[in-house]
């Protein structure tokens, strides 16, 4: 989460975290990890994915990412203000979400089947900078 927090700050993005978290974010943990930028991060925590999705504007552009998706990341035309949604590091997005939002779910291409998935922070970086590239920044 430290790497993703840094990514969000560097790209002026808001980090939304969905509970339950698989890690602790406390002032002491943040200080111990040397995350001196954390206090500047736009961070919003949500009790569940349902609460998060319900909190979005009705016209929000939501884009989901999963290794189980059929369409590659590069098939997506990003819009300014898109919400980029990833699953947890160990399990990814749940099958129910992938099925419900299949038309808005994409994958980062991988070319070796021995790799189950990319590290979450790496995946987020790839997607965020592809969106920025497409938007002409």
Predicted regions span which residues?
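Post-transcriptional modification and biogenesis factors for structured RNAs
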Residues: 1-137
């Amino acid at each position: 989460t430290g790497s993703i927090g840094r990514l969000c700050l560097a790209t002026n993005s808001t980090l939304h975290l969905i509970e339950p978290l698989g890690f602790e974010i406390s002032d002491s943990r943040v200080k111990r990890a040397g995350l001196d930028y954390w206090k500047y991060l736009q961070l919003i925590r949500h009790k569940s994915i349902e609460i998060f999705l319900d909190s979005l504007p009705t016209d929000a552009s939501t884009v989901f990412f999963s290794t189980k998706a059929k369409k590659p990341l590069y098939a997506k035309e990003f819009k300014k203000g898109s919400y980029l949604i990833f699953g947890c590091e160990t399990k990814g997005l749940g099958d129910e979400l992938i099925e419900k939002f299949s038309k808005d779910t994409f994958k980062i291409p991988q070319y070796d089947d021995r790799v189950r998935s990319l590290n979450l922070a790496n995946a987020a970086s790839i997607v965020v900078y592809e969106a920025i590239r497409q938007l002409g920044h």
